[in-house]
UniProtKB/Swiss-Prot annotation:
Iron as UniProt keyword: no
Extracellular side: 143-217
PROSITE patterns in the record: NA_NEUROTRAN_SYMP_1 (PS00610), NA_NEUROTRAN_SYMP_2 (PS00754), NA_NEUROTRAN_SYMP_3 (PS50267)
Transmembrane regions listed in the UniProt entry: 50-70, 78-97, 122-142, 218-236, 245-262, 298-315, 327-348, 381-400, 430-448, 465-485, 506-525, 545-563
GO biological process terms on file: alanine transport; amino acid import across plasma membrane; amino acid transport; beta-alanine transport; gamma-aminobutyric acid import; import across plasma membrane; modulation of chemical synaptic transmission; neurotransmitter transport
Paired cysteines (S-S): none
Keywords: Cell membrane, Glycoprotein, Membrane, Neurotransmitter transport, Phosphoprotein, Symport, Transmembrane, Transmembrane helix, Transport
Stated role: Mediates sodium- and chloride-dependent transport of taurine. Mediates transport of gamma-aminobutyric acid (GABA). Can also mediate transport of beta-alanine and hypotaurine.
Signal peptide span: none
Highest taxon of the lineage: Eukaryota
Name of the protein: Sodium- and chloride-dependent taurine transporter
Predominant place of localization: membrane
Cytoplasmic topological segments: 1-49, 564-621
Amino acid sequence: MATKEKLQCLKDFHKDILKPSPGKSPGTRPEDEADGKPPQREKWSSKIDFVLSVAGGFVGLGNVWRFPYLCYKNGGGAFLIPYFIFLFGSGLPVFFLEVIIGQYTSEGGITCWEKICPLFSGIGYASIVIVSLLNVYYIVILAWATYYLFQSFQKDLPWAHCNHSWNTPQCMEDTLRRNESHWVSLSAANFTSPVIEFWERNVLSLSSGIDHPGSLKWDLALCLLLVWLVCFFCIWKGVRSTGKVVYFTATFPFAMLLVLLVRGLTLPGAGEGIKFYLYPNISRLEDPQVWIDAGTQIFFSYAICLGAMTSLGSYNKYKYNSYRDCMLLGCLNSGTSFVSGFAIFSILGFMAQEQGVDIADVAESGPGLAFIAYPKAVTMMPLPTFWSILFFIMLLLLGLDSQFVEVEGQITSLVDLYPSFLRKGYRREIFIAIVCSISYLLGLTMVTEGGMYVFQLFDYYAASGVCLLWVAFFECFVIAWIYGGDNLYDGIEDMIGYRPGPWMKYSWAVITPALCVGCFIFSLVKYVPLTYNKVYRYPDWAIGLGWGLALSSMVCIPLVIVILLCRTEGPLRVRIKYLITPREPNRWAVEREGATPFHSRATLMNGALMKPSHVIVETMM
């Protein structure tokens, strides 16, 4: 087929096949329907809205508290080798794939796969399960940050001294620890830091285990309610509100990170901290765990396999050059992670010098960095209240825009399933309120005295790297080997005016699936049951619950395949051929061969087959 004819077919395909189903415009009101206006899917008011929304969605807490620690732990500068291999081999290709599918189909994270390849629409359901679980526990971090922010508005920070009601007789302030002769004469194991006691005894009121949940922490419950209310009002009007809020939430954290970077680099001991952060240890690359950490960090930091990037892309205009901006956003994301390491480790180097200990003794990851190491560092600086307020505002904004972008992706995907019902009147807003309320109630289990154990269980299993790798593999497999990488490239050319370099197509077909399979297998081989603080061992029932959370998303893909095959009549070969082919208004081919479509939503099954030119379907024709 000539190139012009091919492109014209693609234009017709997008117009007639992949166009949004009726009633999919956020904010469509009864008066619009009364005027007979055909509802159109809302689009970003400008490309800056999309760019800042994506930047806010994946530049989050993981860039600040996870990447620097992984870099130090896994060989310093040597860690960048597997990191960049996974970045160009899987991170950027999958990120762009999700955005461009959303833009091409104008659909959310579930219905886009129903139009591209109905048999594998379970990919969308798996993504929604993951992001729904993620939204429940990720926002708890913001509740902790909010609590710390409120506590920072004091002349003396409450975690700087041992004279509070929650402190124990074993609490020792750092001024005493610095007195080496006094410290050596005592047993270090018998004493704790005021910042640790504030975290464990005041903020968490930590119980003895997950089977002792204890009472609800009302102060944290109110903080959690506050951040959920902020999240709701940021997204309740769809992209009209989200696209404007990110002008502040996605840019201000970068300014504060720059301020913290400059401050950290001017502290004594900063040079040693940065050396510790980047000094390469090539021998660490022999450890498979280093490669697993690199792969999972890429998937976490790019917010892929969650349906959020697909939903954000679905609001792009059809001719928008998303390839260019996706590449620039990828550079921004990874660059932020790298620069954050300088800000964090310069301060950790200062801490180590002030305490007279090795940097390895103060280096933390995750909540340990945000709520123990850094709060401890600000107590050693001039103007500790100012730096504490600045840090927790930055932390709150970094997490908040990631949270509401992920919730927006979740809502868009679910609303697109039932547009004729949820797009009427104010039903979308009511639905968002219901989803946020349910997520808040589930999150209350994590702000009890045993809530930290529940939080760690969700973090370790519910949105684990294994789940994301599983989804990414099937996304690439479907596009490269069923829909056809060349077919998608034709669509991309029609949208942006040119074909991207072939490395994307090769990554979808070979490189990304290979990296996902390798990382997936090694993750299972190297699996270690969850512990808290390397001391508390979770009971067997909790480990089983954790695996249940992980499998709840992974099982969606094979489960949907089985359900669709069972609900479609005809010979198995014909059913498969019918279900792996994109839909078209004019029925032909398969139905003449005796396959009868299953009875699902009319928007999916009112069409039949587009003549395929991709690998697996061609072998079955």
